[in-house]
Amino acid sequence: VDNKSMKNLTFEKYGLSPEKVEQLRAYKILPDKQTLKNLIKAYETDKAEETEIADFQRELSQPIDEKYIRFLLEHNGGIPSKNRVKGSKVVIDRFLAFRSAYRFHSLIDLYPDFQKQGIPIARTPAGDTLLLAEDQQIYLFNHNIQDIEPNPIATSFANLLMKLY
């Protein structure tokens, strides 16, 4: 992803680190047990390997945007420092990791739910999913209507990052 579209954009690892868990425990503001377990699992997510992404790409009926592959290898998802998408009402809660022990942070585990429509790349706080479609554009899968909204949010992955503010 070229640096211009990434200017001032950082990605924080999704989940809870051991230090953060201790902090929350000290302040007595831990989430419920299940959520806590999931967030700890999500934090333990390893880096994505080029080989596993290549294997996934072979199984797919669609190409994967090169810039998105680079993003996965470099950041493997995370919480963007800017999370609103210009020109839409979409807010990004987090970009998904390629693979994670927490299913709802794991592209590879969520993909079967969307197959024909695209690759899940991010989630919104409302529980909707951003998909990278076969035409390489980014669409919103609205969980209320269980379908894709017709107009793309962005024309490509790089364009999506550029639109974040």
Predicted features and spans:
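Compact, glycine/acidic-enriched structural inserts
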Residues: 147-165
